Amino acid sequence: ILDVELNTILPTVTISGSVVEAGTGNPIPNATVLFTSPQFDNTLTSDANGLFTIAGFFPGTYDVLAGNWGHRTYCSSGQNVSGGSNINIVLDKGYYDDFALDFGWTVSGPSGNEWEIGVPVSTTNNGQTANPGADVATDCGDKAFVTDNGGGGPWDNDVDQGNTILT
């Protein structure tokens, strides 16, 4: 038996920030804030005062997305996040959902191939694209709501045995 001690190779930091409404500066409670990079994803929720904090965060370059139902999604690519970073996010009022974040949609219906948020996987039929393998380039992030996102032929991962409903 060999005793082994694991050391943290990467340093971690604590970051904090706020989510407020444009024009009023009012805090936005329960806003989702996502820090994403090729190596890490961290999802946070703002508190009743629109504030968030995370300890044990790996510093680096992240895409930052934030949103809340009733506000337009915030997107910032290539943001350097380091120790002591205070990330202040301002959301414009409005109804908008590009599915980069999950705002609580409900999936129902008898089908086994249900809606899910994911990076779209292309399907083809006779060499032609039947379903695209990418999200819309003009919105935040790279995710979309798709049904059974498995790729292959258009009949491999489609909706069978009834409907699947997204509300």
Residue ranges and their predicted role:
Residues 98-164:
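Extracellular glycan-recognition surfaces and repeat-rich motifs
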Residues 4, 13-21, 50, 89, ...:
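A short, amphipathic beta-strand motif
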Residues 1-10, 80-98:
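Extracellular beta-sheet/turn segments enriched in Thr/Pro/Gly and aliphatic residues
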Residues 2, 42, 50-52, 85-87, ...:
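Short strand-edge motifs at loop-to-beta-strand transitions and within beta-strands
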Residues 17-29, 102-104:
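Structural motif
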Residues 1, 25, 70-74, 80-82:
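Short, exposed coil/turn segments at beta-strand boundaries within extracellular/luminal domains
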Residues 27-29, 34-56, 78:
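Short, acidic Ser/Thr/Gly-rich low-complexity loop/linker segments typical of extracellular
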